């Protein structure tokens, strides 16, 4: 149980936390391989395997999240392709109620995401997340992903917050680990970031 009297700042992840991760998973594993095959030619199944291998090689780095990087690497307009399936962008069922409650509280609410600005802008366009958030910060602004403890140091340097009185809600184990190592005291995660996938028993 969270002691809200002990929290001044709430740091919220976006993809998989406030928004259903199904959109992102569908885009990268199904829509992108199909459209790549249509544009560049080739067998979609083989292309899917090749793309997943290239993408997974960047996991945990800023490139993993960078639409400019993937547009350059794949010779595609990734943002335009993401718009093609933007109808799948959706908040989790409890998101709006949670955000309304936070807005009515004493807490300062920040969106802290690894999403590239192009992806972030698209999702803000298709949701009302921005109405409930006082600060929106992409890790691309700081040049380092949330998986790195240095990210949290830079975040605090730019926008002061007390880690001992902050809550981070995130669906990624490595992000929660880096935040804990930095000293963020209150951590919370979700058991089902993607509504089309099974509940997680743990973060491992």
Question: Which stretches of residues belong to each language-model region?
Answer:
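Flexible coil/turn residues that form the inter-helical turn or adjacent wing/linker of helix-turn-helix
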Residues: 63, 105, 172
């Amino acid at each position: 149980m969270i002691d809200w009297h002990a929290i001044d700042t709430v740091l919220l992840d976006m993809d998989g936390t406030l928004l259903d991760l199904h959109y992102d998973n569908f885009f990268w594993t199904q829509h992108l391989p199909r459209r790549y095959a249509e544009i560049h030619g080739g067998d979609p199944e083989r292309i899917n395997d090749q793309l997943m291998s290239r993408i997974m090689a960047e996991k945990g780095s800023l490139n993993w999240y960078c639409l400019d990087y993937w547009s350059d690497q794949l010779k595609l307009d990734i943002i335009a392709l993401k718009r093609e399936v933007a109808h799948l962008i959706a908040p989790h069922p409890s998101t709006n109620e949670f955000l309304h409650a936070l807005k009515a509280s004493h807490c300062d609410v920040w969106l802290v995401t690894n999403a590239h600005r192009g992806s972030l802008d698209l999702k803000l366009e298709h949701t009302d997340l921005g109405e409930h958030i006082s600060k929106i910060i992409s890790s691309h602004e700081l040049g380092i992903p949330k998986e790195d403890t240095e990210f949290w140091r830079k975040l605090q340097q730019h926008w002061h917050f007390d880690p001992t009185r902050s809550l981070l809600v995130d669906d990624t184990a490595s992000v929660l680990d880096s935040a804990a190592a930095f000293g963020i005291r209150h951590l919370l995660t979700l058991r089902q970031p993607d509504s089309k996938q099974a509940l997680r028993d743990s973060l491992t």
